[in-house]
Amino acid sequence: MEQIIRECEKRNIFVMIDETYVEFAPCIEEITAIPLTKRYDNLMVIRGVSKFYAAPGLRFGYGITSSEAFLKSLHQHQNPWSLNSVGAYTGELLLKDADYFRETRALILSERARMFARLSHMEGYKPYAAYGNFILVRILKGGLTSFDVFEAAIKNRLMIRDCSSFESLTGEYIRFCIMNPEDNDRLLHVLNSLI
């Protein structure tokens, strides 16, 4: 990553790295680009709270950069009402809640590993290793479509993503978010019942 940023710096190219899902990674320190912002003023790392803190309507995010020139330009072009007071206050509270961060991270990491392991041993499905809060799964059983799996999940009051509209995927795929252990077990039961 640093080599790319360095080459972009030589060419006067500003780089933005989206780390919206970084909180879900096993070792944040190994993959974050934030330390590079101290060495390169052509870099900004952006993060949001909507994914990890389950607050999609909040629309709260932040960026880290050492570029005073970029910050000045950003402030000049920024919509004066880009963040309302409720969003600012809530975002501040969320980012200060160390217990939520620690507990949620532990739950996601353990449940993601457990779900991946269980699906890996379930004939008819091929899960793909993930660093996010969701797992992509290919359906291997002939005649079983992603829509069939979606419908079965909905009937059991579980929401998954039918990936048939993903142009880059050929074949039958579903994607699901990591949930609490009970709901994950319910999803495993639904998936197992279809093969």
Locate predicted features.
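Active-site pre-lysine segment of PLP-dependent enzymes
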Residues: M1-V15, E19-Y53
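PLP-dependent aminotransferase class I/II
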Residues: N42-H121, Y125-Y128
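Short acidic/glycine-enriched loop/turn segments that link adjacent beta-strands
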Residues: G57, Y131, S168-T170
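Residue-level recognition of strand-loop junctions within catalytic nucleotide-signaling folds
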Residues: S66, K96, L140, M179-P181
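Conserved PLP-binding catalytic core of the aspartate aminotransferase-like
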Residues: I108-L109, M122-N156
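PLP-dependent enzyme catalytic core of the Aspartate aminotransferase-like
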Residues: K155-N156, S165-I195
